[in-house]
Amino acid sequence: RSQKIELNEFSQPTPELLELAWTFAVPGADRMRSQPTVGGGVVFIGSQSGSVYALDAKTGCVWWTFNASSEVRGSISVELGTDDLPESLFFGDFQGYIYKLEALTGKLIWRRRADPHPLTTITGSLVIYEDRVFIPLSSTEIVGAIESDYECCTFRGGVIAVDKNTGDTRWRLYSVDKARTQYSESGEVMSWGPSGVPVWSSPTIDEKRKL
């Protein structure tokens, strides 16, 4: 990201003035892919084990922990309430589930399967806009393709929109047409296509044109 120095309060001498305030060792993790989200004095972050943490931004102390089904790779998306404090949290996990939590307590409000394909995964952050949440669909089918008896490949990347209050699907847009059988390898395992075109990152909303 490029930005003119005069537009940025973070000037060149600033790093020399920074001091470590606190650290947090995430249990059971040897990597971190989820970027922290800060709101209302709280740091929200997912982890390799599937745990989602709410940490005090000043002290690093844990307010609460929620355990998802699998690794959370995207950032936690925060919906603010009327008081401009975090009200709800939205995120997806590596097994393709999407979640809505109560920001104050970490209580589960709803949990939904993003797509019926068994190898669906979610790596990008969810995007909240008006009454909907937009979810990018990706897959681990490339791993399944290693197996000689796996009929590859049928997954289709895309984006879905769900109702933020209920988690019910409003619409679903796939990147490619539905896969069809193409040919049989060795007369036993069928090959399928087209497939793929996963969406790894977060969708972008054009508020002016509602796109």
Please report, for each region that a protein language model flagged, where it lies by residue.
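Blade/loop signatures of beta-propeller domains
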Residues: 1-21
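Repeat-blade elements of multi-bladed beta-propeller folds
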Residues: 1, 29-51, 70-98, 118-151, ...
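Surface-exposed loop and turn segments in beta-propeller and other repeat-based domains
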Residues: 25-26, 113-116, 172-193
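Beta-propeller domains
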Residues: 10-16, 47-60, 67-68
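A structural motif specific to WD40 beta-propellers
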Residues: 19-21, 61-64, 107-111, 170-171
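Short loop/turn segments that connect beta-strands within beta-propeller blades
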Residues: 56-59, 102-105, 163-166
